[in-house]
């Protein structure tokens, strides 16, 4: 399936939306994906990012699977991120039927070597991709056991399929998406540091019902009406807490 929603067509986005709604999660927006998947392209795993007012817990989901799509894990991070920018590597495999390959193994390996590295890949994209401002990508391509392995910091529209045809056959048309698989994507350290984890504190902090933290700050959750009391007159209480914990954000529980 393609990622973006099209009328009368199944897509990752529409199926993911259905799965969330099946779990009673109706308020969310901005579904972004970490790795590009064109029409007919498979994905063994991908990362999807949404902004939602719901506190979504993996353990409490009644439905984790829908036709061809399964939620494996949920992490909480910051809102309104440019999510694809926080992914450092994408890994794809293109497995084209051997009988359709025209180039020799030597020629294929030579093409892989020539196309690996930091290059301007404008000629290996679609008309849509040509309109993008930046066409420079850092990519490694290898040919092993009849498959092309692509690893890169990002890929242009149709880039892997056009490069695959050039490497295997010397042709610049995109090969079919059905032979392409997104294998996995790698987080950046920055995104890793933004992920919020629940904290269990031995000492009780008055008015604080729950604590989450990432590498940058703590979030102290309080019941409605208790925020002012936790912060204290002229911020006295929160200043003392910041001396102990560092940066703190105070939020009222919904």
Regions found by a protein language model. Name each.
Residues 1-45, 52-54, 79, 115-203, ...:
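Core RNA-modification/binding signature centered on pseudouridine synthases
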Residues 30-33, 70, 206-211:
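A short linear hydrophobic-aromatic micro-motif
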Residues 36-53, 57-124, 158-159:
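RNA pseudouridine synthases
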Residues 106, 209, 246-248:
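Residue-level marker of intrinsically disordered, low-complexity segments enriched
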Residues 248-254:
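Interdomain boundary/hinge elements
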């Amino acid at each position: 399936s393609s990622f973006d929603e099209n009328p009368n067509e199944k897509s990752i986005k529409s199926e993911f939306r259905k799965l969330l709604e099946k779990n009673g999660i109706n308020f969310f927006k901005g579904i972004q994906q970490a790795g590009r998947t064109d029409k007919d392209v498979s994905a063994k795993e991908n990362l999807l990012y949404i902004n939602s007012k719901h506190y979504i817990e993996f353990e409490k989901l009644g439905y984790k699977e829908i036709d061809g799509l399964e939620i494996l894990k949920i992490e909480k991070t910051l809102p309104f991120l440019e999510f694809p920018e926080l992914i450092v590597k994408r890994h794809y495999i293109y497995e084209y039927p051997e009988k359709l390959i025209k180039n020799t193994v030597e020629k294929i390996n030579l093409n892989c070597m020539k196309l690996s590295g930091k290059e301007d890949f404008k000629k290996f994209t679609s008309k849509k991709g040509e309109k993008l401002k930046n066409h420079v990508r850092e990519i490694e391509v290898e040919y092993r056991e009849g498959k092309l392995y692509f690893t890169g910091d990002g890929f242009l529209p149709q880039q892997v399929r056009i490069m695959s045809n050039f490497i295997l056959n010397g042709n610049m048309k995109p090969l079919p998406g059905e032979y392409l698989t997104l294998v996995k994507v790698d987080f950046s350290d920055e995104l890793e540091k933004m992920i919020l984890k629940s904290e269990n504190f031995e000492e009780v902090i008055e008015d604080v019902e729950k604590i989450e933290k990432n590498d940058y700050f703590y979030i102290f959750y309080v019941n409605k009406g208790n925020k002012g009391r936790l912060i204290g007159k002229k911020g006295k209480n929160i200043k003392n807490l910041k001396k102990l914990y560092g940066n703190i954000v105070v939020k009222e529980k919904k």
